[in-house]
Amino acid sequence: MLGCGVQVKSKANKSIGAFDMNALRWSKIILCTDADVDGFHIRTMLLTMLYRLTPDLIENNKVFIAESPLYEITSKDRTYFAYNEREKDQFLGELAGQKYTIQRSKGLGENDPDMMNLTTMNPKTRRLIQVKPGDIQQAAQMFDVLLGDNLTGRKDYIAQHGSEYLDDLDVS
């Protein structure tokens, strides 16, 4: 799919091409998922797959995340796109006393094509987050804890650190 092969060393991979950055079909790999918790889970799985199969793409700054709006807020003369709760609250504060409508995005597949063209798909206006290699060992360890085979380790991590992520929960 990407054209560059994979970096997995295994006898079972004989039919899969060896990794070659020069064969990459695109200058950027852009992950686009829903802006809710389910979308974040899918994004994490895609990043894990890329990290495990093609870590050089991350190390060479080829992987990006496209943010999609979570809310569309329309007032009399303007439309605002909020990408998180903080931005939504900020826009609503600016519109205090005015009439507006607010629509929560149900997912990329249900967004209006015009809205997607104005936001997520438009190279001039979209928000891209570059996935940076950072501390690759720390990232590898976190991927293994959250998505690896060690169920006890994952439960222990969640029990010890779960409270640190309470503000990020989507309970709507």
List each model region and its residues.
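Conserved phosphate-chemistry cores used by DNA topoisomerases
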Residues: 1-172
